[in-house]
Amino acid sequence: MAPPVRYCIPGERLCNLEEGSPGSGTYTRHGYIFSSLAGCLMKSSENGALPVVSVVRETESQLLPDVGAIVTCKVSSINSRFAKVHILYVGSMPLKNSFRGTIRKEDVRATEKDKVEIYKSFRPGDIVLAKVISLGDAQSNYLLTTAENELGVVVAHSESGIQMVPISWCEMQCPKTHTKEFRKVARVQPEFLQT
C-alpha cells in the first residue's frame, strides 16, 4: 500500500535538517526545511543517506497562447462585428482549459476588409485555424486573425449535421444535400493533414 500523499503550502515547516536534506521546492531556515511551493511532499533516499526532501507541483505549467501563435479554436457565437471563439489548441498542443478569443470583422481576411460579413465567414460550431495578434482587452479575450490563406475554417458542419467539403476559398458544400454555405475557408497545409 502506497504511503498517503502529504500536501504542503509555501512556508510550511516540513522537517529539521537532521531528518533530511533540502531538495527542489524547499528552502532552509533556522535548522529546518520549509516548503517554497504548494504541492506534494516527496522524500527520496539513496544508499542509506539522508532523504532528499522536495515539494513537487501536481500539474505542469499551463501552456498559454502567445502573440504570433497559430491556434485551433471553436466558434461559440457570432454577430455583425465579430466572432467569439474558444481556443482549444496552441499549435498541436491541447490546452487543459480553453481560452476565449475574438475574431473581429476587420481581421477576417487581408483584402476587401470593408466587404467582410461575419455570418458569411463563420458559424457557431466551426473549427477555425487562427493567429494570435494581441493578448486582448479587459474581458481577457485574445484577439485573433484569419487574414492569411492558411487560416480560416477547417471543419464545418451543414444544417443537416454532415461535415462539409471546401469547394473554394469562400464556400463549403454538404456532400449529402449539395447545399453550399459561405465560409472563410483555410487552405490547409500538407503538414497539418492526417493520412
From Swiss-Prot:
Keyword presence, Methyltransferase: no
Entry keyword set: Cytoplasm, Disease variant, Exosome, Neurodegeneration, Nucleus, Phosphoprotein, RNA-binding, rRNA processing
Modification sites for Phosphoserine: 21, 98
Ranges for domain S1 motif: 66-147
Any Gene Ontology CC annotation: exosome (RNase complex)
Cellular compartment(s): Nucleus, Nucleolus; Nucleus; Cytoplasm
Clinical disorder: Pontocerebellar hypoplasia 1F: A form of pontocerebellar hypoplasia, a disorder characterized by structural defects of the pons and cerebellum, evident upon brain imaging. PCH1F is an autosomal recessive form characterized by hypotonia, global developmental delay, poor overall growth, and dysmorphic facial features. Brain imaging shows pontocerebellar hypoplasia, thin corpus callosum, cerebral atrophy, and delayed myelination.
PANTHER family linked: 3'-5' EXORIBONUCLEASE CSL4-RELATED, EXOSOME COMPLEX COMPONENT CSL4
Subunit relationships: Component of the RNA exosome core complex (Exo-9), composed of EXOSC1, EXOSC2, EXOSC3, EXOSC4, EXOSC5, EXOSC6, EXOSC7, EXOSC8 and EXOSC9; within the complex interacts with EXOSC6. The catalytically inactive RNA exosome core complex (Exo-9) associates with the catalytic subunit EXOSC10/RRP6. Exo-9 may associate with DIS3 to form the nucleolar exosome complex, or DIS3L to form the cytoplasmic exosome complex. Exo-9 is formed by a hexameric base ring consisting of the heterodimers EXOSC4-EXOSC9, EXOSC5-EXOSC8 and EXOSC6-EXOSC7, and a cap ring consisting of EXOSC1, EXOSC2 and EXOSC3.
Family designation: Belongs to the CSL4 family.
Protein name: Exosome complex component CSL4
GN (gene name): EXOSC1
